[in-house]
């Protein structure tokens, strides 16, 4: 059964997350994971988060009266090189595809901030207080920006726009909405097993995307890329056969677990957990079984082998279980199993 290669690996029932004091920083926790999977998943997700998520960024700027980036502007305290460095740090959210044109015009004295830019459509400036430049009295400045969408880092020489305009300065673009990603792998306990992995991913964004959503997008990218390597059709799960028109489940589920040839430890653990029938047992997941006191991986493997011989496995869903007259049914179908 090839599906055992992935079905028998333990995996988290859910992923938890919490936001830090800075709302743009979030930690995502996944546990328990098989030993080694914390490092494998953490490193892969980190790389995809930093390199492959799409975002918006300014790709070029035109400043009235400026021909190149090594100029200075009368009445503006910063030179053009410093202004461009400040422009690179403007964080944007844009749902539509680019390019788009934005304009800012301001007279001095005063500070020109990102929030002074006139946006269009659904575009949003995420750090409106960010300073672009400072104007002295009687100074003025008009700038036109080109905004585009993409992923990763694109240097200025790839942002050249050949539209014949003089003074259009291409700039480096950091499209990624992710600022920082780190991960930590620790040991965690599940039942009697002490060395499972606990993965904690900490993501800092520029506010264009929620950190939890960013992890989901990265996981979807990995899923899509890895699907190329799957060269087989996954076997379909076989439903539990109905052995009798009166029952909606296999009568073998009415067999009591104490009739199985289990070790004393395994049998006692099932008894203490009020698991009486096989139907009770197969609806338990591996994670639930490992949380049973004194129940370890050895007992889990023993039970899985016994169930496999009967064509059953843990984690099955039996909608009609338990029947109201389970004791009577167990006696009636005793000879059939």
Swiss-Prot record:
Asked whether the keyword RNA-binding is assigned, the reply is no
InterPro entries the UniProt entry points to: DNA-dir_RNA_pol_insert (IPR011262), DNA-dir_RNA_pol_RpoA/D/Rpb3 (IPR011263), DNA-dir_RpoA (IPR011773), RBP11-like (IPR036603), RNAP_asu_C (IPR011260), RNApol_insert_sf (IPR036643)
Region described as Alpha N-terminal domain (alpha-NTD):
1-233
Instruction: Look at the named UniProt entry and state the broad enzyme category this protein falls under.
Output: transferase
Annotated GO biological processes are: DNA-templated transcription
> Which Gene Ontology cellular component terms are annotated?
cytoplasm; DNA-directed RNA polymerase complex
Q: In terms of domain of life, where is this protein from?
A: Bacteria
What do we know about how this protein assembles, alone or with others?
Homodimer. The RNAP catalytic core consists of 2 alpha, 1 beta, 1 beta' and 1 omega subunit. When a sigma factor is associated with the core the holoenzyme is formed, which can initiate transcription.
Cited function: DNA-dependent RNA polymerase catalyzes the transcription of DNA into RNA using the four ribonucleoside triphosphates as substrates.
Q: What is known of its domains?
A: The N-terminal domain is essential for RNAP assembly and basal transcription, whereas the C-terminal domain is involved in interaction with transcriptional regulators and with upstream promoter elements.
Question: What name goes with this protein?
Answer: DNA-directed RNA polymerase subunit alpha
Look up and give the organism this protein is from: Bartonella tribocorum (strain CIP 105476 / IBS 506)
């Amino acid at each position: 059964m090839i599906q055992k290669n992935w079905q028998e690996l333990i995996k988290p029932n859910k992923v938890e997350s919490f936001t830090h004091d800075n709302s743009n920083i979030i930690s995502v926790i996944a546990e328990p994971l098989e030993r080694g999977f914390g490092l494998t998943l953490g490193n892969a997700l980190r790389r995809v988060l930093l390199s492959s998520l799409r975002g918006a960024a300014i790709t070029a700027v035109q400043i009235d009266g400026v021909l190149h980036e090594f100029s200075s502007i009368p009445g503006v305290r910063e030179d053009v090189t410093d202004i461009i460095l400040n422009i690179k740090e403007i964080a944007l959210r844009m749902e539509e595809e680019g390019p788009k044109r934005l304009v800012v015009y301001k007279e001095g004295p005063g500070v020109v901030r990102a929030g002074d830019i006139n946006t269009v459509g659904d575009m949003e400036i995420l750090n409106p207080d960010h300073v672009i430049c400072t104007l002295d009295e009687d100074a003025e400045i008009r700038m036109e920006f080109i905004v585009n969408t993409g992923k990763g880092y694109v240097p200025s020489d790839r942002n050249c726009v050949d539209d014949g305009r003089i003074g259009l300065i291409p700039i480096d673009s950091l499209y990624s909405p992710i600022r920082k990603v780190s991960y930590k792998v620790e040991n965690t306990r599940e039942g009697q097993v002490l060395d499972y992995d606990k993965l904690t991913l900490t993501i800092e964004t520029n506010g264009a995307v929620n950190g939890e959503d960013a992890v989901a997008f990265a996981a979807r990218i990995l899923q899509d890329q890895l699907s190329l390597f799957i060269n087989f059709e996954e076997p379909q799960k076989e439903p539990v056969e109905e052995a009798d028109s009166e029952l909606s489940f296999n009568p073998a589920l009415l067999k009591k677990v104490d009739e199985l040839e289990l070790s004393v430890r395994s049998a006692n653990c099932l008894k203490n957990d009020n698991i009486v029938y096989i139907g009770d047992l197969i609806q338990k997941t591996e994670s639930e079984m490992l949380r049973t006191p004194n129940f370890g991986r050895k007992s889990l493997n023993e039970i899985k082998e016994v169930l496999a011989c009967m064509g059953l496995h843990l984690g099955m869903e039996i909608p009609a279980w338990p029947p109201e007259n389970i004791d009577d049914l167990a006696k009636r179908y005793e000879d059939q199993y």
